[in-house]
Amino acid sequence: MAPSPTPPAVRRPASALIPQMRGMLDQIRRFGDQPGLRRAMPAILILAVTVLALAGWILLREPARVTLYPGLPEAEKARVIDSLTGGGIAAVIDERTGEVAVPGAEYHRARMLLAAQGLPQGLPDGNALLSDLPMGTSKSVETARLRQAQELDLARSITEISAVSAARVHLALPERSAFLRESQPPRASVFLQIVPGRTLDGAQVEAIVNLVSSSVPGMARQDVTVVDQMGRLLSRGSDDPAVLLNDRQLQHRVQLETLYRNRIESLLTPIAGPGNLAVQVTIDMDFTRQEIREEQVDPDRTALLAEQSQIEETADPQARGIPGAVSNSPPPEAALEAGAPPTAAGEAAAPMRSRSQNSTRNFEVSRKVETTLPATARIARVSAAVVVRAQPQPAATDPAAPPPPLLPEALKADLERLTRSAVGFDADRGDVVTITAQPFLDTVVPEASGWSAEPWVADLARQGFLLAALAVVALGVVRPILNRVLLPAPAAAGALPLGETAVEVGEGESLDDVRARLKARQGALTKNMLDAARSHEEQILVIRKLVEEDEGRIATTIRQMIAAELDTVK
């Protein structure tokens, strides 16, 4: 199947478009050459220049704006803008940040105006909820109001931290009852909105946790959760002893390094000069905690701890005789005889005695118990590095001679000795001290901002630039246009005056009168004569006169017109 022929418009070469474009340009040129458009062109240019000048004035006269209150809620922004607009202050919403911005000169007046109206309101006061509590309120409603007031007060207190723009506190308080043996502990959740560009360190998060837990009875610190607007849990690991210990250890190490560095700088700066030293100190610390308990026993040395002694003695006579009345009667009175020996009865009458003794003694062997707790933070190694600015060396007279050292050996030895004394150098510990000399790169120190950084200087420069732009537009554009419109154009060199080059047709003049005037005039004719002719016959007469004066130019013009028409037809 033969392919369909390509349309002629597609096969038209690119060279065929050139005559069409030339024809369009000629049409535009002819449209611009119309007398009415030419007469209206100055007014159009003046209007365009005026519009551009007004636009530049509006853009350049816009003052520098500053943010009034960062981090305001949307409802607060609407109230703030309404209040400022009513007070005559041009407040707008910044397109980049979305914050309320006011002119720099009106900043303090805007804050005073908003403060007088109680804006921004922020969080309500918790006491207002309790003061509006009506009589006869149920216990559940009163408890809910009390919890809400407590949440608002805690949120207001947390918002006072400079890095926190807004805060919300949620309390989960279980109901207390005497009939419950075990109850759930109270818990709290804190949501923080951090100011852009700011962060909360661990100490600030710990302070918020302590603030909330101390404000609620029975709440433990581990029952408080802190979250920021990015969804990050800030209170994670705040109660972990290992985490707290690591933070304290790092802080202690940084403090020691700073102390040693300050010691070295205070000793070496008077020698090398301010800004000619760079000191860094690194300390390796051992935080291992050891408990050594030692017990010693000496068997040769004893000590009497307690002694107990018990002695029992009995002296009662023993019972004798036959039980009965006769045996219990007293014996008869005996007759005493001189010189008679003692009888057996006398011996039997002597009492019986018994004695027992018991003694107990407790001894303790000599013992020595010693408990040693070494220091928790022990410096294991100290490394100090000192860089001294090398002084410029004079030009060497002998190129073959070795260059002199950047730091003299005597001075280097003195600096090293002072550095070792400052850090408490211990070779057995493995301490290292390094001192070298190198040329420093000159850093550009920012100059202090003077009067040129003041806001009024920028405003004055903006106004001056605006006035200069208006002067350039007025003198370079508007003035030439007005001169061209209001003042007659000067005659060209070799041309006749206006009265001799233009044909003015008065009222009541006939064609013969105009023809007679043209014949009498022997000067050059211009296009203004054709524009001044009113009737068709007058225009033909002027064209004939032009043909008589310059036949070659007229023929060339007609030839170009015919060629353009032929190109358009093709």
UniProtKB/Swiss-Prot annotation:
The keyword Transmembrane helix applies. Keywords: Bacterial flagellum, Cell inner membrane, Cell membrane, Membrane, Transmembrane, Transmembrane helix. Residues 334-351 have a biased composition (Low complexity). It is found in: Cell inner membrane; Bacterial flagellum basal body. InterPro entries: AMP-bd_C_sf, Flag_M-ring_C, FlgMring_FliF, FliF_N_dom, YscJ/FliF. It is a multi-pass membrane protein. Residues 354-363 have a biased composition (Polar residues). The M ring may be actively involved in energy transduction. Residues 312-365 are annotated as: Disordered. GO terms for molecular function: cytoskeletal motor activity. This is Flagellar M-ring protein.
